[in-house]
Amino acid sequence: MSLSNSLGLLGRKVGMMRLFTDEGDSIPVTVVDVSNNRVTQVKTQENDGYVALQVTFGARKASRVTKPAAGHLAKAGVEAGEIIREFRLTADVAAQYKAGATVPVTAVFAVGQKVDVQGTTIGKGFAGTIKRHHMKSQRASHGNSRSHNVPGSIGMAQDPGRVFPGKRMTGHLGDDTVTTQNLDVIRIDEARQLLMIKGAVPGSAGGFVTVRPAVKVKANNTDVKGAN
């Protein structure tokens, strides 16, 4: 199968480690488990109005699957997964797959390729403006008695008499869907279906991520020769 510009893989963030090149340079990498990506449906222009590949990842107990989902998965002949995502494709690429097929990592990615990784960031709960928006704290003394870690003025006087929408204030921090772009694939463990991607990716260890070929490709300056 040829590499696709649109097809990606679902995976689970295992954690971070480092690899060393032949020159002794240390490369921080995130290990992503992309094993057992299974095709649950091939959507076509004639039947669905667009072309896409529906993929599932992970394993879920049959008792935790709704009846409509169970019937959908049984029709494809695959076991229930933890997450299901769609990848928009061209018709010629989608025609290479059938429902029930497994997508191996080497069919989508190669060492040295740029990828975009989407995940859910770690939730921080309710946070103040200093932690949430990196604002500066106020003076510790010299007339300041109770306003050390507050944002200060959030509006104006009677005109306009309101707080403008979008004002940076306290609130929930984290637990957002974030995409980190243009990360390098340093190494692929084909036997265990692992991707080793340079740098950090969103989320905590054990979280689900979606890995796609990079959309905004930049020049690759990473030397991965002999990374082990």
From Swiss-Prot:
PROSITE patterns per UniProt: RIBOSOMAL_L3
Pfam families: Ribosomal_L3
Gene Ontology cellular component terms for the protein in this record: cytosolic large ribosomal subunit
Bias kind Polar residues: ranges: 140-150
Biological process annotations from GO: translation
Keyword Cytoplasm: no
Keywords: Methylation, Ribonucleoprotein, Ribosomal protein, RNA-binding, rRNA-binding
Molecular function in Gene Ontology: rRNA binding; structural constituent of ribosome
Matching SUPFAM superfamilies: Translation proteins
InterPro entries: Ribosomal_uL3, Ribosomal_uL3_bac/org-type, Ribosomal_uL3_CS, Transl_B-barrel_sf
Region called Disordered, residue ranges: 135-159
Entry keyword Signal: no
PTM per Swiss-Prot/TrEMBL: Methylated by PrmB.
UniProt function note: One of the primary rRNA binding proteins, it binds directly near the 3'-end of the 23S rRNA, where it nucleates assembly of the 50S subunit.
Subunit description: Part of the 50S ribosomal subunit. Forms a cluster with proteins L14 and L19.
HAMAP family: Ribosomal_uL3_B
Record family assignment: Belongs to the universal ribosomal protein uL3 family.
NCBIfam families xrefs: L3_bact
The protein's name in its UniProt record: Large ribosomal subunit protein uL3
